[in-house]
Amino acid sequence: MRRKRYVWLKSILVAILVFGSGVWINTSNGTNAQAATITQDTPINQIFTDTALAEKMKTVLGKTNVTDTVSQTDLDQVTTLQADRLGIKSIDGLEYLNNLTQINFSNNQLTDITPLKDLTKLVDILMNNNQIADITPLANLSNLTGLTLFNNQITDIDPLKNLTNLNRLELSSNTISDISALSGLTSLQQLSFGNQVTDLKPLANLTTLERLDISSNKVSDISVLAKLTNLESLIATNNQISDITPLGILTNLDELSLNGNQLKDIGTLASLTNLTDLDLANNQISNLAPLSGLTKLTELKLGANQISNISPLAGLTALTNLELNENQLEDISPISNLKNLTYLTLYFNNISDISPVSSLTKLQRLFFYNNKVSDVSSLANLTNINWLSAGHNQISDLTPLANLTRITQLGLNDQEWTNPPVNYKVNVSIPNTVKNVTGALIAPATISDGGSYAEPDITWNLPSYTNEVSYTFNQSVTIGKGTTTFSGTVTQPLKAIFNAKFHVDGKETTKEVEAGNLLTEPAKPVKEGYTFVGWFDAQTGGTKWNFSTDKMPTNDIDLYAQFSINSYTATFDNDGVTTSQTVDYQGLLQEPTAPTKEGYTFKGWYDAKTGGDKWDFATSKMPAKNITLYAQYSANSYTATFDVDGKTTTQAVDYQGLLKEPKTPTKAGYTFKGWYDEKTDGKKWDFATDKMPANDITLYAQFTKNPVAPPTTGGNTPPTTNNGGNTTPPSANIPGSNTSNTSTGNSASTTSTMNAYDPYNSKEASLPTTGDSDNALYLLIGLLAVGTAVALTKKARASK
């Protein structure tokens, strides 16, 4: 199946075979030169000025010397010319070979191909691996069917646009970026090109293509390839392809190479069931499930991906070549069914168990270097192996490989493994386990720390602790016809256990730790009012221990918990207006200036809005939390004095409290208006809404004087008798009096009541005396006097 890997090389070799291993001179049956002719016999080296070409033509023309002359007839006999790898720098003179049909000038130093411009009989040109940049001379060679120019310096391929008979065109490894000139070359069956191409649209009409190589370009979009349904081989390595969906309908493909792209999803490949050769190396593939049905595959390359599971490959039993190198494999058991494998690569993985290959008896080449394999006994029956590469593993015993007599290539260098740890002692001894193919122990080449070897043991004398000792081995071994150096290093770790003591404010815990290991960090200790800073090698100061990187030394250690004191915030809340202080744990707060509040006396700062405990700024210490202290007040009590014409009573009421309204006072001849904050005028006190201010107050009873009715004339109004039988004399205005219409019976009662006035406790209480009772007495006496005078006057008149 290797032939498919070199499809373009195959085409070149076919052309070379046509030429043969030597040089042929064919008769042209009288065909005359079309491009140029010589008119007389001329020395070879004058026609072909390049020394190397002249030497070649001497042989081709059957001459002895390059100075021998030849005629045009001689030159016309040459139809094919094989001149590769001769160091030719110029093809001057080739223009006289008018009958040339095939030439091979590969691997020379050509820069100018002008002599070809009129050689229109040419059908096949091979000029790969030169220094050609200008291919204009090929523009008129319309009979060309095959043209190979890979690995030159070509940028412009426009001169090829009219070469419509081309069916093979090879232009890889140039500097081509534009392939639009190819759009009309619809006869092409094989095509390769460039390394700077990004746009494949010009290929849309090349539907006869069977083999296409677009390797080493800058292609990301391959949608146009969906039209090329006749493709059998597609090589698209080293591009920028991430989406291969367009390939899903190319079911004629038997060879596909997508090596070196950006593939993650290969689901499209599930439909390409005719594939026999698939190269997906150097991508980002992890899921191989789409490959499970590609049962015709014989070659599969999956190296340098992200594969950890190869189960989908278990049914691909036609595989002969499988590459799984540079992945993330640990389990390779699915390959045990692939019994037709002859070639298997597993290098640079994480494989420790190679036993699944034991059933692959057809294996000829096996590569599993740079893994973790220690036991190779499963290889014992793989007698067809001729190439075994198993370096950089952990192999110590070669005995199982003794029967692999067909080996010609062998690699067993740089084995390396570490034994299980043993406890450190002054004298340490371990057995040597390294064996060659015959089973004999291989003596150490070097032993660390002054150790010595007495078969089968290696011994060290270690007066002070060291964490490991080691030895190396190095011996030439031969298996079959393959000879290599079996070499490696064996490391023996030594455990040293020491105490790590952890101190937290005088309390101690101890852990045993092996030297060189990381300590397990204890749970962080908690200390009220403090933040744990870390574990230090001193009680104060010192160096903080890093549990991620610091390793146990070869001695006991003491680590101390260190803390930093926390700061907390005390918020002072004065009826919603706040200030704050930041104080360390257990610190004393600075007492704020005592706040004031109208009508209240500041009691102090408390830990609750109401109730709670009072904060003592001299002794109370900051707790391990933020706190809020509230200003609390006691309402002040103020005195309200009620003044009724100089007679007073009082009430004590808290600030903003409501006063209890006294019983309405009375005053003869007046109507009570209410209580006012001034003797006259002022504001009337509303006992339902007005609240006690933050000061003592006096409220004054105010009255309005009742109107006085005028006295009746003619004595027509009879006196009024009250319930007590007293006669009320008619009302009269008395100058200087403060009262009017006051009865004699009520006057005495009012005076008595006023002398005993209590506005809050007596329901019978009357207003305090106003001083008007004396005037009433005088009025009464006056009225009696007037009445007496009137009576006496009437009596005198009657007696007359």
Curated annotation (Swiss-Prot):
As for membrane topology, the entry says: Peptidoglycan-anchor
Q: Where are the B- repeats?
A: 518-587, 588-657, 658-706
Sites of Pentaglycyl murein peptidoglycan amidated threonine modification: 770
What Gene3D superfamilies does UniProt report for this protein, alphabetically? 2.60.40.1220, Listeria-Bacteroides repeat domain, Ribonuclease Inhibitor
Residues cleaved off as propeptide: 771-800
LRR repeat boundaries on the chain = 77-98, 99-120, 121-142, 143-164, 165-186, 187-207, 208-229, 230-251, 252-273, 274-295, 296-317, 318-339, 340-361, 362-383, 384-405
Signal peptide region: 1-35
| Ranges where the record places region 3 X approximate tandem repeats, type B | 518-706
Keywords annotated in UniProt? Cell wall, Leucine-rich repeat, Peptidoglycan-anchor, Repeat, Secreted, Signal
Q: Where is this motif: LPXTG sorting signal?
A: 767-771
Residue spans of biased composition, Low complexity class: 711-756
| Predominant localisation class | secreted
Residue ranges of every copy of the LRRNT domain listed in the record: 36-76
Q: Where is this region: Disordered?
A: 705-757
Matching entries from InterPro entries are given as: Cu-Rt/internalin_Ig-like (IPR014755), Ig_E-set (IPR014756), Inl_IR (IPR012569), InlA (IPR047600), InlB-like_B-rpt (IPR013378), Internalin_N (IPR024634), Leu-rich_rpt (IPR001611), Leu-rich_rpt_4 (IPR025875)
User: Where does it live in the cell?
Assistant: Secreted, Cell wall
Listed GO CC annotations: extracellular region
Please state every residue range assigned to the domain named LRRCT.
416-505
Function, please? Mediates the entry of Listeria monocytogenes into cells. Binds to host receptor cadherin-1 (E-cadherin, CDH1).
Q: What family name appears in the similarity comment?
A: Belongs to the internalin family.
Q: What is this protein called?
A: Internalin A
**From which source organism is this entry?**
Listeria monocytogenes serotype 4b (strain F2365)
Corresponding gene? inlA
